[in-house]
Amino acid sequence: MYSSKRGLYCKSIFLPINNSDFLSMFIYAVAYNKLIVSDKVTGEVHMNILKKIEMYRQEEELLKWEGTFGEYLEILREKPWVAQSAHSRVYNMIKDAGIDEVNGKKEYNFFSDQLFGLEEPLERLVEEYFHPAAKRLDVRKRILLLMGPVSGGKSTLVTMLKRGLEAYTYTDKGAVYAIKGCPMHEDPLHMIPHSLRKDFYDEYGIRIEGNLSPLNLMRLQEEYGGKIEEVVVERVFFSEDKRTGIGTFSPSDPKSQDIADLTGSIDFSTIAEYGSESDPRAYRFDGELNKANRGMMEFQEMLKCDEKFLWHLLSLTQEGNFKAGRFALISADELIVAHTNETEYRSFISNKKNEALHSRIIVMPVPYNLKATEEERIYEKMIRESDVSDVHIAPHTLKIAAIFTILTRLKEPKKGDIDLVKKMRLYDGENVEGFSSADLKELQNEYGDEGMSGIDPRYVINRISSTIIRKDVTSINALDVLLSLKEGLDQHSSITNELKEKYLNCISLARKEYDEIAKKEVQKAFVYSYEESAKTLMDNYLDNVEAYCNKNKLRDPLTGEPINPDEKLMRSIEEQIGISENAKKSFREEILIRISAYARKGKRFDYNSHDRLREAIQKKLFADLKDVVKITTSTKTPDEQQLKKVNEVVARLVDEHGYNSTSANELLRYVGSLLNR
């Protein structure tokens, strides 16, 4: 986060602010652990950490507020959103971080720096659950159950919601006010009698749901003499650590776990003083359902939980209240999020005893990411957060690991004209010759459960870590990782022989992809100005094709004499992509039509305008260089000229392509071995 005259940069997005918002946004950024106060132009850091801590403490103190219920109503008159429900607060938190429209689909900035390749599941989650729940539609009376494979992002998603809510309550839009001294940080509006709630709605436009808790009902009479307007209200800030507005429940041994973990328990230190278990002062309202009031509760491994714990959720989700001790039903407004895997969920719904809970649950699938580029970003993030971030990972290493992983998650296309690699490229947004967006949509609709199985990111990162430690050097490449992935399959107890065979095939496919990438990389390094060489060859080819199709002659650049189109040059390029003698005429005409179409649209046909032609140019360039590369890279005792060339190529790989000297030399040796096969 850093400030400017116009706004505040926070969480990689720009949020316009005015002076009154700066304070809360500063706290928002600090609470989100993103505080970097610096000059926008120079990047100069202005404060050391102790100064930041002091400033954070001072600003947090300034955000605190305390006043009477009457003064709270004045705040509501100015800022009616303060009284929003828990579901509404979560939705607005996501919305306020920014929403982008990409190809007709919504992408939420709130999730963008932690969850990759899950745009569709996240859009479904927000638009089919959070948005209607924020509008008080019936979906808010459901437990949100995230279902997906291991390491698919379920826990990360829930953690983001929890951390985000903590930070959001420091902002003006996310402010939460509660009755002071209430262990459940209860909504002050619960004090308004039911008979006056319609009048309150007419005046403020705010609906009130829920009843005053037994403890606050007693306090209202005994401490304030029934005078609602004098009850003290305070601003509260959600914190999982302080058990304010965010709760987490994790099942343990059914024999030892007590329902009090959810709903609170009798306070044995005060029971003698107050003399009755039905006296709310002799009860500890410190269960997870109590503490998560106004915010959210994470129910870990919900489907493994003992049934007696789940029944409390029936009333809470449907009616907004739960039973605790010898009291009337206690109102609670909270989002309940649970997560599970597909196997546990199938087992749960097959049990007839759980039918009552089925209708109280809305299941949101969270599959694995199916885009190789996004998978690569996941690995980059995980490595950045590890202790091996200083190890040099050669270019394309993580990309090849990602390709392998995605191939294990994809299902074989039902149509015979497309293979798994082409399907992966289509999913990744690449243009694949002969396939359209309609074909992509058809592929995506073939299987409803695609992405619910395959290799998980943690396995890949574990194998990369193993490679780094075993190799005991500060550099690894794609071949090292593929070998480690292959070896790891033998140690993976849950992989059947059938799956192992499939995964080994995926490693072979990923290896072929790497072979092509490696050859192109070396090719670019050998040609000093690769793009210029490719452009020159392309222009030469297009001039000849145009002359051929129009039955014209070309001019010799030296003598100026008319000459026939260079058939040898054209065929040497076309043969690289399998264009036969019979097909050459139609291919050339198709190129000319494409050039005309570009010209009509005011565009220039260039090296990147035709996938197959680009591939042909690349292969032709490499074919011309093949012998040079082969001799240079495979000679055990290179002469002075060859050595100079190798050093030049290594330097170019290091300076322009992101290699270090070790990985550059390994790449050259590998490509040399490929060409000598």
Which residues does each predicted region cover?
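Short hydrophobic targeting helices and cationic amphipathic motifs
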Residues: 3, 15, 20-23
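Long, basic/Gly/Ser/Thr-rich N-terminal segments
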Residues: 46-80
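Short, Lys/Arg-enriched N-terminal segments with co-localized hydrophobic residues
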Residues: 21-22, 27-46
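Conserved ASCE/P-loop NTPase catalytic core
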Residues: 76, 80-677
